[in-house]
Regions:
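Glycine-rich NAD(P)-binding loop of the Rossmann-fold in SDR/ketoreductase-type enzymes
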Residues: 43, 72, 114-122
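A glycine-rich helix->loop->beta "capping" turn
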Residues: 59-63, 83-96, 102-107
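N-terminal Rossmann-fold cofactor-binding loop
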Residues: 18-19, 41-46, 71
Length: 130
């Protein structure tokens, strides 16, 4: 007997950042399993292709869209948000999962500390822009 989900996800669109591994990959896979169209966001093309293949192996009828963006730069976040808004009439679910571990002090081209830019500024900006 199949269990009916509390919130049906068929015909819903979900965007998952950091979707190429770990929690993000599992989240994207399970959203797809529940029938959502999933936009996978990652920064590494090889890992993104592997993530897409892994999800399709588990959920052959998954509807996936892979986007490559490095969220450490707010200019990339703005570009991605505009692209998503142009391509989709509605975004139902946003999973801000992308993050990095702090390492040696690294400053982005926009002048922000790398982990602060990725883990905090991009989340705030993406949520507000979408």
């Amino acid at each position: 007997m199949a269990v009916s989900p509390l919130f049906p996800l068929q015909h819903k669109t979900a965007l998952v950042t950091g979707a190429t591994s770990g929690i993000g990959l599992v989240t994207a896979r399970e959203l797809a399993r529940q029938g959502a169209r999933v936009i996978l966001v990652g920064r590494n093309p090889d890992k993104a292709a592997q993530a897409r293949a892994a999800i399709l192996a588990a959920v052959p009828d998954a509807v996936l869209d892979v986007r490559l963006f490095d969220l450490a730069l707010l200019s990339n976040v703005r570009h991605m948000a505009a692209e998503i808004q142009g391509d989709y009439s509605q975004l139902d679910i946003l999973v801000n999962n992308a993050g990095i571990m702090p390492g040696p002090l690294t400053v982005t081209a926009e002048g922000h500390e790398l982990s602060w830019a990725t883990n905090h500024l991009s989340v705030f900006a993406l949520t507000n822009l979408l």
